[in-house]
């Protein structure tokens, strides 16, 4: 297990940070595809359309080709939301991390191992928190696949929690999805509590993938 340390982001980290973030998000595409394949409506589509073609044309070859193209379409649909999300982030906050986080009363940290960035996490103040609360939102948690299982993600979350304590925040909040079971297990194991859920878009509603809202409340002084 290679040693690692956590430090604040520097502009020279940008390319490596974008790489960790992009690969981390794109890893969700296969699991989204598998989730979609298991939906009853998807199974009905994959069986019903080819069977209808066989009944109409009498061609099993046409049915096989149809299944192949339906699978390609589903794979495209599974990947498109994640790719659009990455593209949006790279155009907005991830385009200038120093401006978006370090100069906006938040922070951005990297986990470094062997002179390589292997993990990232960010935090920003919540603009309109509930009355009487001062909340910090955790963003962009990701660890490269080769360095998982070493406690890096937990250490990055702890870094955000300590930053929030030091700055006098009452809560740390975040959002994740039902698809990201590893992240959900991590957060709940560290004391985060579920506070709500929603569908971000109509697509996510159709495929039954919810966004889960979580909160880590600090004890009152």
UniProtKB/Swiss-Prot annotation:
The keyword Secreted does not apply. Keywords: Acyltransferase, Developmental protein, Gastrulation, Membrane, Transferase, Transmembrane, Transmembrane helix. SUPFAM superfamilies: Acyl-CoA N-acyltransferases (Nat). It is an enzyme of class 2 (transferase). Its EC number is 2.3.1.-. The chain crosses the membrane at residues 53-73. The keyword Membrane applies. It is a single-pass membrane protein. One of its GO terms (molecular function) is N-acetyltransferase activity. It is found in: Membrane. InterPro entries: Acyl_CoA_acyltransferase, GNAT_dom, NAT_camello-type. GO terms for biological process: gastrulation with mouth forming second. Residues 69-219 form the N-acetyltransferase domain. GO terms for cellular component: membrane. Pfam families: Acetyltransf_1 (PF00583). Belongs to the camello family. May play a role in regulation of gastrulation. This is N-acetyltransferase 8F1. The lineage of its organism: Eukaryota, Metazoa, Chordata, Craniata, Vertebrata.
């Amino acid at each position: 297990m290679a040693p690692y340390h956590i430090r604040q982001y520097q502009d020279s980290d940008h390319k490596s940070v974008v790489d960790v973030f992009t690969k981390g998000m794109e890893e969700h595409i296969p699991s989204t595809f598998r989730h979609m394949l298991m939906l009853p409506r998807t199974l009905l589509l994959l069986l019903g359309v080819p069977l209808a073609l066989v009944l109409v044309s009498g061609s099993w070859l046409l049915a096989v080709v149809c299944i192949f193209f339906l699978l390609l379409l589903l794979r495209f649909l599974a990947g498109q939301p994640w790719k659009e999300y990455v593209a949006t982030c790279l155009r907005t906050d991830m385009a200038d991390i120093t401006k978006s986080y370090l100069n906006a009363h938040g922070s951005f940290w990297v986990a470094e191992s062997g002179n390589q960035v292997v993990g990232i996490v960010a935090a920003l103040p919540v603009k309109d928190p509930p009355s009487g609360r001062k909340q910090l939102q955790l963003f962009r948690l990701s660890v490269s696949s080769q360095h998982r299982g070493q406690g890096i993600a937990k250490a990055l979350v702890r870094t955000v929690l300590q930053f929030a304590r030091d700055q006098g925040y009452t809560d740390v909040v975040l959002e994740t999805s039902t698809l990201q079971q590893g992240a959900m297990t991590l957060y709940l194991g560290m004391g985060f509590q579920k506070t709500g859920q929603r569908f971000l878009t109509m697509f996510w509603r159709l495929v039954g993938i919810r966004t889960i809202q979580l909160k880590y409340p600090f004890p009152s002084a």
